[in-house]
Amino acid sequence: LLPFGGEADLYLVAARYKKQPRLFFVHGNSEGISWKAAPGMGLRATATGTLKLDSVHVDSDAMLGDDTFNYQAFIDLGQLHWCALAIGACQAALDYLIPYVNEREAFGEPISHRQSVAFMVANIGIEMESMRLMTWRATALAEMGKPFHRETYLAHVLCADKAMEIGTNAVQLLGGHGFTKEHPAERWYRDLRVLACVNSGLHL
């Protein structure tokens, strides 16, 4: 799936050139390009869809970089962007949950006084910090020009796994309100669930 593909004037397309993965700039009005909207359960604001290229020709200067271009590093940086998205959405969920569980009352007291609720919120904070630190470590190595593929993979797996869990728990903590449109938790759940599916998914 490609975000904002129907609105793009220029695409960055991965293809093989001389048996090596490379990136090419392709104009959106090139002959042979077609776009089909494919709305998903999450990330609806990005207007996702599928892009089809049928015998599309590009000029020789459309290729990004030279023979030293590090395709794997490019992919890894993209993974870190997805990690940052997950962390931001999880932080939004936590910021919403804390006042909710402190103000929402059941059986004469805030639901945050229940240990099961308090532990769940605390675990979200702990898991978020681990997601953030793993992503920062991989990003720092990348900025220093050091190998960062391993750290990126670890951050991606952690963020994809914990993002699903945090999204689910955010809905659960809101109870019956969690799956209504009156509260944003259901949207965060859908967006965070996508992260385990995109970019080859959680288990590949």
Show the residue positions of the predicted features.
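Glycine-rich phosphate/pyrophosphate-binding beta-alpha loops
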Residues: 1-5, 77-82, 193-201
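A short core secondary-structure module
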Residues: 1-33
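Glycine-rich beta->alpha junctions and the first turn(s) of the following alpha-helix
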Residues: 35-129, 195
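Residue-level recognition of alpha-helical structural elements
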Residues: 110-113, 117, 148-151, 181
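Amphipathic alpha-helical coiled-coil segments
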Residues: 162-170
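Glycine-rich phosphate/cofactor-binding loops in nucleotide/flavin-utilizing enzymes
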Residues: 174-204
